[in-house]
UniProtKB/Swiss-Prot annotation:
Family the entry assigns: Belongs to the universal ribosomal protein uL23 family.
Biased composition (Basic and acidic residues): 131-144
Protein's GO biological process: mitochondrial translation; translation
A GO molecular-function annotation: RNA binding
Protein's UniProt name: Large ribosomal subunit protein uL23m
Keyword Mitochondrion applies: yes
Localization terms from the record: Mitochondrion
Subunit structure: Component of the mitochondrial large ribosomal subunit (mt-LSU). Mature mammalian 55S mitochondrial ribosomes consist of a small (28S) and a large (39S) subunit. The 28S small subunit contains a 12S ribosomal RNA (12S mt-rRNA) and 30 different proteins. The 39S large subunit contains a 16S rRNA (16S mt-rRNA), a copy of mitochondrial valine transfer RNA (mt-tRNA(Val)), which plays an integral structural role, and 52 different proteins.
Superkingdom of the organism of origin: Eukaryota
Organism: Homo sapiens (Human)
Signal peptide annotation: none
Region (Disordered): 108-153
Lineage of source species: Eukaryota, Metazoa, Chordata, Craniata, Vertebrata
Disulfide bonds listed in the record: none
Keyword list, A-Z: Mitochondrion, Ribonucleoprotein, Ribosomal protein
Amino acid sequence: MARNVVYPLYRLGGPQLRVFRTNFFIQLVRPGVAQPEDTVQFRIPMEMTRVDLRNYLEGIYNVPVAAVRTRVQHGSNKRRDHRNVRIKKPDYKVAYVQLAHGQTFTFPDLFPEKDESPEGSAADDLYSMLEEERQQRQSSDPRRGGVPSWFGL
């Protein structure tokens, strides 16, 4: 789980010169379907186990974990290269972490919808003006008496 590093021998009374860093990177993922508020979805490496994930969250982030469920998601096999050979995306593991009693998590809204601003009304005015000009160009000339424009004189 940790990198292969040679640490100096620990002597009684001496400082501990170690910093724990993992080789694992986990991604917090917005769930595709609605889940309970106490369930969080992660994308984790294939080598990582449930116990590793529980220790990772409790040890590094101090997040109390009640249960961890995992599944393997197979990568898609639909893309093809220039030789018409299938290209398979790598498999990954999805972990569903159920938080301890009373803990909830809501995924943050990273891209909120923008409100109507005064600039939007100026754009609407410009659009309506251009639309009126287009209608005026397409309307027939009353002096032609119903003769189509393609029938020129």
